[in-house]
Amino acid sequence: PFRTAILRGEPRSGKSLLGRWFAHAGLGETIDPADAMEETALFHRWNRAQEEGTALLLIPEKAPWEIALPDLRSRLGAALALEIGQPDDDMMRDLIVSHAARRGLMLGEDALTYVVPRMTRSFAAAERFVAVLDRLALERQARPTRNLCRDALETLYGPDQGRLL
């Protein structure tokens, strides 16, 4: 019955991007970060959205979202809960390829097959890995090979990470 959803996910998972798309497509209003908004103001915005028939997408920055105002807490408890989960191997691969392409890096299949199972499963980790890989490639004037990927993993996670598995 309520036209409100709460979208959660880890940092760098694309929550804000989805919220902008939602609003720009005219699907409703996005409040991001919703947990930074004063609770009484958010309560009134929620009520106004229901009265106007406007969909509302709330994106809290922190989890759990502690709500002190009882009326707001009960209303948000009835909202649709959406969550962007941790990326699986296929998503990690796609994230690495995407971040690398934006930096002009082309990773070969051998490098990707090596890196993906050794990575921490998070959107931010994929971004950090490619940033380190890009820096190492520039410093060494080298292509992003399997060996350079191993060095990037070791830079991020320590000297044994590149040898795991």
Give residue ranges: language-model regions:
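Walker A/P-loop nucleotide-binding motif
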Residues: 4-18
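Conserved P-loop NTPase "ATPase switch" module shared by AAA+ and STAND
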Residues: 25-41, 45-48, 52-62
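Short regulatory helix/loop adjacent to the ATP-binding pocket of P-loop NTPases
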Residues: 64-77
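Conserved AAA+ ATPase "sensor/coupling" helix adjacent to the nucleotide-binding pocket
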Residues: 75, 79, 93-106
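Conserved AAA+ ATPase "SRH/arginine-finger" region at the nucleotide-binding site
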Residues: 79-91
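Short conserved motifs of the RecA-like P-loop NTPase core
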Residues: 106-119
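The conserved phosphate-sensing helix
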Residues: 119-131
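Conserved C-terminal helix/linker of AAA+ ATPases
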Residues: 137-156
